[in-house]
Swiss-Prot record:
GO terms for cellular component: mitochondrial inner membrane; mitochondrial large ribosomal subunit; mitochondrial matrix; mitochondrion. There is a cross-link at K150 (Glycyl lysine isopeptide (Lys-Gly) (interchain with G-Cter in ubiquitin)). As a component of the mitochondrial large ribosomal subunit, plays a role in mitochondrial translation. When present in mitochondria as a free protein not associated with the ribosome, associates with mitochondrial RNA polymerase POLRMT to activate transcription. Required for POLRMT stability. It is linked to Combined oxidative phosphorylation deficiency 45: An autosomal recessive mitochondrial disorder with onset in utero and characterized by poor overall growth, failure to thrive, global developmental delay, poor or absent speech, seizures, hypotonia, loss of walking, acute progressive neurologic deterioration, brain lesions, and facial dysmorphism. Laboratory studies show increased serum lactate and decreased mitochondrial respiratory chain enzyme activity in patient tissues. Component of the mitochondrial large ribosomal subunit (mt-LSU). Mature mammalian 55S mitochondrial ribosomes consist of a small (28S) and a large (39S) subunit. The 28S small subunit contains a 12S ribosomal RNA (12S mt-rRNA) and 30 different proteins. The 39S large subunit contains a 16S rRNA (16S mt-rRNA), a copy of mitochondrial valine transfer RNA (mt-tRNA(Val)), which plays an integral structural role, and 52 different proteins. bL12m interacts with NOA1. InterPro entries: Ribosomal_bL12 (IPR000206), Ribosomal_bL12_C (IPR013823), Ribosomal_bL12_C/ClpS-like (IPR014719), Ribosomal_bL12_oligo (IPR008932), Ribosomal_bL12_oligo_N_sf (IPR036235). The lineage of its organism: Eukaryota, Metazoa, Chordata, Craniata, Vertebrata. It is found in: Mitochondrion matrix. This is Large ribosomal subunit protein bL12m. Transmembrane segments: none annotated. Keywords: Acetylation, Disease variant, Isopeptide bond, Mitochondrion, Primary mitochondrial disease, Ribonucleoprotein, Ribosomal protein, Transit peptide, Ubl conjugation. The modification N6-acetyllysine is found at K125, K138, K142, K144, K150, K163, K173, K178, K185.
Amino acid sequence: MLPAAARPLWGPCLGLRAAAFRLARRQVPCVCAVRHMRSSGHQRCEALAGAPLDNAPKEYPPKIQQLVQDIASLTLLEISDLNELLKKTLKIQDVGLVPMGGVMSGAVPAAAAQEAVEEDIPIAKERTHFTVRLTEAKPVDKVKLIKEIKNYIQGINLVQAKKLVESLPQEIKANVAKAEAEKIKAALEAVGGTVVLE
């Protein structure tokens, strides 16, 4: 008990405390889930009994079971329409099917064999860009070759072109379109050079 001198100061607090006890004694619906679980022993046992175990079969809500039954009764055309509508509604992009080994084992053997043959044969792509490389030069035609090289390499003078021809093989131009590479090759071979397109 509080001393008599302190009672006037604590009076309002004691009144609140008494009101709280009175409120707690009444059966007021619980707001807090933890207090609700603590206060109702029977409901707590039901909640624990309803928790799924790892090895127990999962029980699905009746709404889900009804959906499965409804979908199972649809025809293939109706399933296709349902699939299309779900993709539009849920904004799912259409992704092609990726065949798996187990699924494809007996499904379409001829198509699978055709795909296997196509995968084994490498497709030769036609190259579109080449590197023009000068490999040899005839000593008689060096002067003509130096002048022609000066036409195809920008910013090179005669001395640099002469050094380039004397230290073969050399790259003349890289990453050139096929038509231009053949044009350069024809021009350099016309003045006595041996050119390789790589």
